[in-house]
Each structure stands twice: as C-alpha cells, then as structure tokens.
Amino acid sequence: MKILVCDTSNSNCSAGVFEDGKEICYELSFETLTHSETFMPLVHRVMAKANVKHEDLDCYAVTVGPGSFTGIRIGIAAVKGMALASGKKCIAVSSTEALARSCENATMTPREETLIIPAIDARNNRVFAQAAEEDTLKPLLPENAYDADDLVSKIEKIPEIIYGKRRQILVVGSGASVMKKAFENAKSKLNIYCAPGAAIMPKGVALSAFAGKEMIDAIDLKASYCAVSQAERLKKNG
C-alpha cells in the first residue's frame, strides 16, 4: 500500500511517501512562511521526488490534531481536496500518537521500561500530550490539553511510575522544553530524558497509518483540537 502522509499540526509542516511501511522519501519544511504558503508546494516536491502521481496512491494519511489550530485546518482541507479529486480514502492520525511512534529507540533504556510523553507546545505553560508505554503505546494518560505542572503531578501518580515498572520518562515534541521546566519546578526525582528534535513526523504518521487504522471517506475527516482556540476563549470571556 502506497500512502502520502502529511503533518501540519506543528510549527514545521512535513510530508512523505511511504509504501508498505517503508519510506520512499519525506521532507520537513523549515521555511518561515505560513503552512498555507508552504504545504502544497512541499507535497508537490515530495511526490515529484518519489516519482508518484495521485492516481498511484492508495490513500492519504494526515494528522488531525491536537496541535496548531490553523495548521490542522490547512492540512485537513488540503488532504480532503486531494482525496476527493483522486477518489481515494483517508486515514486520520493523532498528532501525539505520530510523535510517539516517530521516536522508537530514542534512548538506550529498554522500551519496555520507558514511559513516553509526546507533547506539543500549546503556549502559556500548556501542552497537548498523552502518556503511554513506549513498547506497546498503551495509553496511561489520555490525549488532552494539560497544564504542564498538572501533567507532572498526574505522571508521578501513574502506578507504573510509582512501582518502578517504567524507570525512564521520554518526553518528545515541541512541548519537551515546557515539560522539562515543569519537572524541574516540581523538583521531580524521576529519570527524565527530553528529546524535542527527535521526532520525524512523516515516519510517525506512516507507522500510525500502517498500524491498521480505518480508512475513511475524505468528507469524514474531522479535526481533534482537544481545546478551544485562544480566539474562542476570548470570545467566551467577553
């Protein structure tokens, strides 16, 4: 199965072409322009490098959140357009799951002893995150928007942490520095390893897509924000 994978949930958008779980090519944009300006040219470059046309694809996989509200909307709209035009199905992928899957073997600690925290910076000491066993990706804290200090408190109460089954915590993603500071503020004695730049999102999206996720019609792609936007919060507060 050949898939175009896309991520616009982070500050840097990315895209790649994968076949049967193997990378053909991918690209991460470091341009300072907005996703609305960079994403589709990025897709065109990746597909040209892979020598792939839309009719050659079996489906499209895209991160649907949480993350950048505007970025998520841009990615979903673009993928919907491509899928509807080519008559292909789509796979919706969680941004935090893709982050977790993209960082396999990021440390020397055995995966069965590691708790992974994929975290996306949501500003104002907040992160979009979840906590999961690194080897199985079994969630121990659900994907949600968390205050970083509150999240540290919740992590320290996870039974697998209390009883030492998971002796290292791996924090990945743009929220890693926020979480590092929160652990320091809490004077936590847990073994923390932060890897903000370890994620290769196209790889994570592809691994999530090839993990047996359901293919859906493009029209059914929906964002998973996990929080209201700042504009909505301001409107609600008058």
What are these regions (language model features)?
Residues 193-238:
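Acyltransferase
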Residues 46-50, 85, 103, 201-210, ...:
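Stable alpha-helical structural segments in soluble proteins, enriched in small hydrophobic residues
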Residues 30-38, 69, 73, 77, ...:
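Residues at secondary-structure transition points
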Residues 50-55, 83-93, 109-112, 216:
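Phosphate-handling active-site elements
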